[in-house]
């Protein structure tokens, strides 16, 4: 009897499911893989959804419709599909969907990266760009970058040709640079600061069943996810509150980003009100967007160079020729290093630190390739798939070959859609200049100052799980000083 009742309930739920989504299927006619009742296509996503979505796109096309539970999601997987979303219909798809993860960890999406498109987002972006991320501000941080790179090189040199955890060293470097330019001093010494950032970044990539299947939201509580998110949010808020309080108490002899925000709160110099939660949310953006992503890129660059010793030798020859007789590489030296820039582009193509762009959401009805897309539809651009598209990059699209960029004018600043690791359009990452200059000068100094030997399996390119895709295992290497 109980089994019979369960079957009836399941039958009714299935009928309601297909009735509810019949309209969506008629409106959005992009190819779509078969889905299951209630969960949609969620069962087809692996721990690395960028890979799963890429493989599905090979069968269902560059613009395909999936259902994450009850939520229809369009996935763009080629350069032209990305152009349609991020350029042709940029304004329409400039907003963000609501997310339990963002609500919990990012001050209810009050930060710039996850805020809905509108006046608040424009205000937060203008503040961050003007006072932290503009080319002028990035140049003003040159001494900080050089000082921290010098400390990093000294740390490596002290290893005396013993194995070092380069992943850990790079993470410390980027954290310290971000802390100094945004907060005025380091906060990672003698604290669990770095562990907290790692936890935050892992959880930002966590899947919450309740966001897509509302009637199963209780499973997030039973699994302990709700409690873990709450703890991370509280721990980070305590840290940010301490940082803000330190600045209010006048702890520091130079004006930094937090000081600017607090001054604007007092005298309303921005022309709009900015409250304490918004200040903490903007500061949080600096860590979310600038720490893991920056260290991860250098980590993948070194991984690929060690796997391709001919490329490493070629890069070292270029850097050491240009910087002959110098003890280190300056940012001015970088300008003439064409092969270095090609290596950076190739690493960004194969290993975009954030392989799936933060989901976009349409603010109004729109026609996308002759399909009517209703307002509120989510769109995900798979940067990992775009960077490995054979039609664009050729039959060796999955191979690390920096030389391809010496033969191509393509750049990663949002105009060439075959290479958009920082996104494009209105929601493009505003920290691109900050990230690129740090990455180039760090990589150049590493290959200039040391010869490198891997102690790991050189074929190991296993990926971690999370919003930022790092190596699954830390990169251990043996450096040999050249000076």
UniProtKB/Swiss-Prot annotation:
GO cellular component annotations of the record: membrane
Chain residues that bind heme: 429
GO molecular function: heme binding; iron ion binding; monooxygenase activity; oxidoreductase activity, acting on paired donors, with incorporation or reduction of molecular oxygen
Bilayer-spanning residue ranges: 1-21
Location(s), subcellular: Membrane
Short name of any one Pfam family annotated for the protein: p450
InterPro entries noted in UniProt: Cyt_P450 (IPR001128), Cyt_P450_CS (IPR017972), Cyt_P450_E_grp-I (IPR002401), Cyt_P450_sf (IPR036396)
Key words of the record: Heme, Iron, Membrane, Metal-binding, Monooxygenase, Oxidoreductase, Transmembrane, Transmembrane helix
Enzyme type, top EC level: oxidoreductase
Annotated EC: 1.14.-.-
Membrane topology listed for this record: Single-pass membrane protein
Cofactor(s) in the UniProt record: heme
Similarity-based family: Belongs to the cytochrome P450 family.
Annotated protein name in UniProt: Cytochrome P450 71A23
Species in which this protein is naturally found: Arabidopsis thaliana
